[in-house]
């Protein structure tokens, strides 16, 4: 089973705030964080990562939520 970590667009966080949180929480390169933030903004959701264990996906989701992002996990189809 694969668990996907998702970031959703919302009316609260700016594009820059989403990218900043992704860099801080995941040590994601700035270019990748900006691309993910743009995807969330344009399509409403961006997949941030996929994990074979549920616990790491939950931990990352919680850290993103602590930054104020609208993040969730789902089982990959």
Where are these regions (language model features)?
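Terminal domain-initiation and capping elements
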Residues: 1-77
